[in-house]
Amino acid sequence: MSKKIKKENLFISTQQDAQQAQILMPGQEQLQFRVEDTFKCPIYLADKPEWVDTLNKASDPIIERVRKNWKKKIKDPKDSTKQMPNSLHSELLWQYPEFKEIANLILQQSWNILHWQGYNLTGKLPMLTELWVQEFPEEGGFHDIHEHGNNHISGFYFLKCNEKTSHPVFHDPRPGKKMTDLQMRDPSKLNYGSGQVHYKVKPGQFIFFN
């Protein structure tokens, strides 16, 4: 005759309010943890509104040329293009003198950030791999989650935006966390368990990240 084995729940799911102490195993003391924030993922924000007008003046003709080129492709019966793209994207801008100042600032700030993060930059100089202006349609536009390969620093400088403008969304880069993630109690609040964060943007705002 087999003996019936009593099964116990090793993981107790509570329905307590978020403000109450969460007790998984009755009678166990609550440890007073010392929390150390290691492997941080900083995002750097700064404002330089005095460049907006000058850079808009330099960028507008470039975007308009890109727009006209796309319209020509759509009208060309020999071209397979049928509609405008999700965004208007310029060529590399460091070749133009109007963008030399912002290019130099990006290089210097990128070096500073990597230095602050503890990297050994002795004998190393930063190099731009990409620099472009991009315009999304008023109806809205978006990019899926992606990365820019072989770049130690990426960033934005916002020229035209308002309270309705789409905002950049940053995702937790740790693949292990993504594979085992749990549902958040309140996704609107930024917490240790949050998987993404976004920032409202304004003209003249820099955002650097890596």
Task: Give residue ranges: language-model regions.
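Non-heme Fe(II)/2-oxoglutarate
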Residues: 3-120, 142
